[in-house]
Amino acid sequence: MKPSIVLYKSIPTDLHQRLAQHFTVNSFDGLTPDNQPELLAALQQAEGLIGSGGKIDQDFLQLAPNLRAASTISVGYDNFDVEALSQRGIALMHTPTVLTETVADTMMALMLSTARRVVELAERVKAGEWQESIGDDWFGVDVHHKTIGILGMGRIGMALAQRAHFGFSMPVLYTSRRPHEAAEQRFGARHCSLDTLLAEADFLCITLPMTEQTYHMIGREQLAKMKSSAILINAGRGPVVDEQTLIAALQDGTIHAAGLDVFEQEPLPVDSPLLTLRNVVAVPHIGSATHETRYNMAACAVDNLINALTGTVKENCVNPQVLITH
């Protein structure tokens, strides 16, 4: 008999068929076990779980006594209680490599659209405000040759540094737990303290995940150390930045502008002051949202689950100490 799994996000038909070759697939639209008796029953038998979103904590795991592996269609896993999973011997799989280039593209798009005021000015043209040759009140600022400061030199940070260095001749500064030799050799990047990064960067680009250590890492004190001409770009996790202090800094001119793909609360509330500011480009967490990359993420997650439940995992495991070997 095939192992039973719960699939709680729609995936392409060919990937669903790939899962079905190995497992009995129970498909659901999201994880709401309180309202879905069928889901509760499926979780009781499930050895595998695959999807994205939802809160996978100790209480949820009690509903799935036979679970051996969970595969998230994302690189982030802050909605999973990793400690609880590990205590149960459940492998947690994610997709850290397939979205790198696309997220770096998104960050460059945010840099360009924010610096050149693309969204704001496009809306003004649509509103019929372009009646004559534009004056300096419609001007933006250059991106090329400006200093980029990357907070978090991981895979996405490296891909962003490559674009900035080779595409826009930007000096690269970065802050991370340790120096990154490849970044320094390939892009002439300079490892520096957070204070130096804040003081010297024209674009502060945040790629950090959400952890206890990174929560509100950028707050009032840090924003005050930035150039008044600086632009903040966040495509890491919303809570890395104290959103209320960011709003104040954008309103009073402490910093020039912000391009944001992530927020403390998602979806962003319709009454958020961020939506009233002309110096903000806000997009709905589109970092990896292309047809190609989302397909590749789903395919990676499918392969991850197959590998985890067949004992053939070689990569992409968040808690490798519990890897299934049988």
From Swiss-Prot:
Keywords per UniProt: Cytoplasm, NAD, NADP, Oxidoreductase
Organism of derivation: Yersinia pestis bv. Antiqua (strain Nepal516)
Catalytic activity: glycolate + NADP(+) = glyoxylate + NADPH + H(+); (R)-glycerate + NAD(+) = 3-hydroxypyruvate + NADH + H(+); (R)-glycerate + NADP(+) = 3-hydroxypyruvate + NADPH + H(+)
Subcellular location: Cytoplasm
Pfam families noted in UniProt: 2-Hacid_dh, 2-Hacid_dh_C
Family, similarity comment: Belongs to the D-isomer specific 2-hydroxyacid dehydrogenase family. GhrB subfamily.
Gene: ghrB
GO molecular function terms listed in the Swiss-Prot or TrEMBL record: glyoxylate reductase (NADPH) activity; hydroxypyruvate reductase (NADH) activity; hydroxypyruvate reductase (NADPH) activity; NAD binding
InterPro entries, alphabetized: D-isomer_2-hydroxyacid_DH (IPR050223), D-isomer_2_OHA_DH_cat_dom (IPR006139), D-isomer_DH_CS (IPR029753), D-isomer_DH_CS1 (IPR029752), D-isomer_DH_NAD-bd (IPR006140), Glyo/OHPyrv_Rdtase_B (IPR023756), NAD(P)-bd_dom_sf (IPR036291)
Entry EC no(s): 1.1.1.79, 1.1.1.81
PROSITE patterns per the UniProt record, alphabetical: D_2_HYDROXYACID_DH_1 (PS00065), D_2_HYDROXYACID_DH_3 (PS00671)
Subunit structure as annotated in this protein's UniProt entry: Homodimer.
Annotated active site: R237, E266, H285
PANTHER family with a match to the protein in the record: 2-HYDROXYACID DEHYDROGENASE-RELATED, GLYOXYLATE_HYDROXYPYRUVATE REDUCTASE B
Alphabetical list of SUPFAM superfamilies matching this protein: Formate/glycerate dehydrogenase catalytic domain-like, NAD(P)-binding Rossmann-fold domains
Its biological purpose: Catalyzes the NADPH-dependent reduction of glyoxylate and hydroxypyruvate into glycolate and glycerate, respectively.
Protein's UniProt name: Glyoxylate/hydroxypyruvate reductase B
Any one GO cellular component localisation term in the record: cytosol
Protein's UniProt keywords contain Isomerase: no
CDD domains, alphabetized: GDH
